[in-house]
């Protein structure tokens, strides 16, 4: 199963890299043309308005490019960093942000090797460089003893950051973290996402949403549009290939309070993920959200929000 998954990813990378060599219009790590990038950014801005709370957007210069950070919530609130899922960007938090920003100072960061408003000006980053990049952002904002929420791939990055000897993280929330405790649970089902990248179409996109969400009809149309354009226009990269489940020792090194949430129809995680989390994370709580898929923060927003807020406060 895993071999099938990685073969599909490799085929995707070969096809898209050949296409980018042939059709590249300008120097951008993510997008082929200026018009495609602008169309995507217009969709991003529309989706971000779904936050429906006051926020500011800031760009932070780093050693590897520009980090785009969206800030919201009370200035005297405890700092809460949000790391989104793959290709989802910080706009994905629209069903959760009002609850999260009520008592916390939010720092939502777009990952610089994916579609979004962060921009990569260096070569693709290694895991070590990803840690450096985020730490530069944390240092810029002088974040100490902050809480962090990571969704899907953002959950994997969160565990990567928390497993470092020197970090300033306090409480951790993982929303169906990808490739973190085990490899993807249902490889054949998730292959729809890879096929979407290979041959993007509205039909394949909707099928992918049906795979990852129990209630795709509840996903806002503006956010759907942005997410679709991310899959349609963005070049693929090999970062997913570098994601491996963390070792027993790496997980045991994390002493922070951790909450792990997955959906009962999750195609990325299963109860085995929660069992391993409970076994090797020394201070861990887990919960399975009913009638939710991998997109549990959208499928069951209120239940997810309540569980997260109760844990953080």
Q: Could you say what each language-model-derived stretch is?
A:
Residues 265-269, 294:
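Acidic catalytic loop of the alpha/beta-hydrolase fold
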Residues 254, 260-262:
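Short beta-strand/loop motif that positions the catalytic acidic residue
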Residues 292-301, 305:
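Catalytic histidine-centered segment of alpha/beta-hydrolase-like enzymes
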Residues 68-116:
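Conserved HGGG/HGGXW glycine-rich cap/lid loop of the alpha/beta-hydrolase fold
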Residues 108-149:
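Active-site loop/oxyanion-hole signature of alpha/beta-hydrolase fold enzymes
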Residues 183-188, 198-253:
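Conserved alpha/beta-hydrolase catalytic His-Asp/Glu region
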Residues 2-4, 10-13, 18-78, 313:
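Alpha/beta-hydrolase fold catalytic core
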Residues 156-164, 171-199:
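Flexible "cap/lid" loop of the alpha/beta hydrolase fold
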């Amino acid at each position: 199963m895993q071999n099938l998954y990685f073969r599909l990813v490799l085929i995707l990378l070969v096809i898209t890299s050949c296409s980018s060599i042939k059709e590249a219009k300008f120097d951008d790590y993510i997008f082929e043309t200026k018009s495609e990038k602008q169309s995507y950014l217009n969709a991003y801005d529309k989706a971000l308005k779904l936050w429906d709370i006051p926020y500011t957007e800031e760009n932070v210069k780093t050693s590897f490019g520009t980090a785009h950070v969206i800030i919201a919530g009370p200035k005297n609130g405890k700092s809460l960093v949000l790391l989104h899922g793959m290709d989802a960007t910080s706009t994905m938090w629209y069903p959760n942000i009002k609850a999260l920003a009520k008592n916390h100072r939010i720092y939502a960061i777009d990952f610089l090797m994916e579609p979004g408003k962060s921009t990569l000006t260096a070569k693709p980053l290694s895991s070590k460089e990803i840690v450096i990049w985020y730490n530069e952002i944390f240092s810029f904002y002088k974040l100490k003893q902050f809480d962090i929420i990571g969704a899907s791939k953002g959950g994997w990055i969160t565990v990567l950051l928390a497993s470092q000897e020197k970090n300033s993280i306090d409480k951790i929330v993982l929303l169906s973290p990808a490739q973190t405790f085990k490899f993807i649970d249902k490889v054949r089902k998730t292959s729809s996402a890879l096929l979407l990248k290979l041959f993007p179409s509205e039909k394949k996109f909707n099928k992918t949403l049906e795979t990852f969400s129990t209630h795709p009809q509840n996903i806002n149309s503006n956010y759907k549009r942005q997410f679709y354009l991310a899959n349609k226009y963005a070049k693929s990269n090999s970062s997913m290939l570098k994601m491996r489940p963390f070792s027993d020792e790496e997980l045991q090194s994390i002493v922070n309070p951790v909450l792990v949430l997955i959906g009962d129809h999750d195609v990325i995680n299963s109860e085995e993920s929660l069992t391993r989390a409970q076994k090797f994370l020394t201070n861990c709580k887990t919960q399975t959200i009913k009638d939710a898929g991998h997109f549990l923060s959208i499928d069951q927003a209120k239940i997810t929000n309540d569980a997260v807020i109760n844990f953080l406060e």
